[in-house]
Amino acid sequence: MSAGPAKNPSVVTRFAPSPTGFLHIGGARTALFNWLFARHNGGQFQLRIEDTDRVRSTKEAIDAIIDGMRWLGLDWDGDITYQFERAPRHTEVAEELLKAGKAYKCFATAEELEAMRAEQRAKKQPQRYDGRWRDRDPSEAPAGAPYVVRLKAEQEGETTLHDLVQGDVTVKNAELDDMILLRSDGTPTYMLAVVVDDHDMGVNHVIRGDDHLNNTFRQLGIIRAMNWDAPQYAHIPLIHGADGAKLSKRHGALGVEAYRDDFGYLPEAICNYLLRLGWGHGDDEIITREQAIEWFDLTSVGRSPSRFDFKKLENINGHYIREADDQRLTDLVKPRVEKTLEQGLSSTEQALLLQAMPFLKPRAKNLNELAENSLFLFEKRPLKLEEKAAKQLENTSGSLLAILRKTLGDLPAWDSESLEKALHDVAEQADLKMGKVAQPLRAALTGRTVSPGIFDVMILLGQDESLARLDDQLSLSPTHS
């Protein structure tokens, strides 16, 4: 294993989702990058729930985010920070800035601000607050008039951000207006809360999507006004769909619970795939968690958006299914099988599923396929045939099935060697290639055209069940007398 980049144990990162929805796949990648950077350095990874939007934030979404993080194996250090609970501290910082003359009260009414924006639109000017209360005395406002608190942003010069992914990015300070810190009802804004929380939590590396890049320059204004040390920033490109458009639900911008529950992916496959979306280590596609922790750094994160590719995710998931422990897969597949069968599996059937797992998993790319491919073991006779399997049997003479039934029925031993010899004998007797014998037999025994190897199928079903299923098809075959 190649040596990873140098380590810095003082690193503190954070993942700060808003609980207005589930943990979507883009957020999961952001969490993963923060977690890996902290774990690589032997530092701290913290979780903050940004629940200041009291209308849209829900307990269900908070629970889903925490559940998603745990499922992905992204453990955090210390207690979860809930942003809403820290509102008094955010207000305290705004009051400090007011006292220091680095923030001011703005009494502009909604009507005045709308007229200002309309004039800016008419003149084709950028729409931003014009600072009309920046240098006015609050005594000029009507008594008891509502106000917001705004940051007195720097107006001269420019700000350069040394971004760990994007490189140097420079913005003229005149392009940044005096943003609101406290609303007219006294509640702190998101922009203020984020800066205060990052500072108080000791966060010194902010790794987030590049859609936050513009916010960073505004947040740096608060940091400078408070004379705080700024964290290092790394703005990672967003994930796009396969067509190059911004990732949406039709591309796969869903919550991680959909990938787990609906699509049947394993968490290690999701993490491996998300890691490779925007970060690379040579030509390595399959990267274990241990390797990811050892190798991860921000210098290998690309600047271009990555494209979400379900096919690649399926292939990676197939790899992890093949590598997974049989008992673990059995436990994961069991509820899916029971849901389809609309009944629970007995202890004997569960043991059969476990016994079948080594033969089932090489052909499955997700847990749904694994469950689907195992159903033949538990379906009641006579089997419902898939359309392709029914056609296969329609095109097979009843005499071939009869020869198979007799040959298999006469076998004294029911093992791979005996079964293989028996099928070869039937193929020779009927002057057919092995596949022409195995395919209709598979259809008769499983009701499908895809299954584990035919000898594995017969051993799993056992002699009695295999012969009974053949008898069912023989009784339906018009060419069998």
Curated annotation (Swiss-Prot):
Enzyme class, first EC level, given as a word: ligase
InterPro entries according to UniProt: aa-tRNA-synth_I_cd-bd (IPR045462), aa-tRNA-synth_I_codon-bd_sub2 (IPR020751), aa-tRNA-synth_I_CS (IPR001412), aa_tRNA-synth_I_cd-bd_sf (IPR008925), Glu-tRNA-ligase_bac/mito (IPR004527), Glu/Gln-tRNA-synth (IPR000924), Glu/Gln-tRNA-synth_Ib_cat-dom (IPR020058), GluQ/Sye (IPR049940)
Highest taxon of source: Bacteria
Compositional bias (Basic and acidic residues): 118-139
Record bears the keyword Acetylation: no
Any Pfam family hit: Anticodon_2
Enzyme Commission identifier(s): 6.1.1.17
UniProt keyword terms in alphabetical order: Aminoacyl-tRNA synthetase, ATP-binding, Cytoplasm, Ligase, Nucleotide-binding, Protein biosynthesis
Cited CDD domains: GluRS_core
GO biological process: glutamyl-tRNA aminoacylation
A GO CC term attached to the entry: cytosol
Protein location: Cytoplasm
Keyword 4Fe-4S belongs to the record: no
Motif ('KMSKS' region): 246-250
Function statement: Catalyzes the attachment of glutamate to tRNA(Glu) in a two-step reaction: glutamate is first activated by ATP to form Glu-AMP and then transferred to the acceptor end of tRNA(Glu).
NCBIfam families, per database record: gltX_bact
Protein name, UniProt field: Glutamate--tRNA ligase 2
Species per Swiss-Prot/TrEMBL record: Zymomonas mobilis subsp. mobilis (strain ATCC 31821 / ZM4 / CP4)
Name of the encoding gene: gltX2
